[in-house]
Regions:
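Short, surface-exposed beta-strand/strand-loop-strand elements in extracellular ectodomains
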Residues: 44-61, 97-100
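Noncatalytic modules at the cell exterior or secretory-pathway interfaces
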Residues: 40-43, 76-94
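Short, intrinsically disordered N-terminal pre-domain segments
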Residues: 1-20, 99-101
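Beta-sandwich interaction modules
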Residues: 30-35, 61-81
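Surface-exposed ligand/attachment interfaces on beta-rich extracellular proteins
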Residues: 16-37
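Short tyrosine-centred short linear motifs in exposed loops/low-complexity segments
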Residues: 19-21, 51, 92
Length: 101
């Protein structure tokens, strides 16, 4: 029987989101993300402080992710994710880990 499994590709990055960042463009600032997976179907975000995220563009509504939601995992079929925009408004640096596939 021929193997019909599609190879799994992913991207992963650990970085520090500077405090007081507004719409931090993850794709531009972390250039090794979205390389293997330019259009992700799933995202997992780990963070050590509350963050706000917009998916794909800066005009989308902010999704507030309190620390109790870490890790945040997008639901199956959530949407095609081409970029992330992160906001931190309390002046604290945030350790962020992103997984895309």
């Amino acid at each position: 029987m021929k193997d019909t499994m599609k190879p799994l590709t992913y991207d992963q990055k650990l970085f520090t989101l500077p405090g007081n960042s507004t719409d931090y463009d993850v794709k531009s600032e972390q250039s090794d993300l979205f390389k293997n997976v330019p259009n992700a179907s799933h995202v997992v975000l780990f963070f050590d402080k509350e963050v706000k995220v917009r998916f794909n563009t800066e005009v989308m509504p902010l999704a507030i992710l309190p620390i109790s939601r870490s890790p945040f995992q997008s639901p199956t079929g959530f949407l095609e994710i081409k970029n992330l925009f992160l906001t931190e408004a309390n002046g604290d640096d945030v350790e962020v880990e992103v997984w895309l596939w």
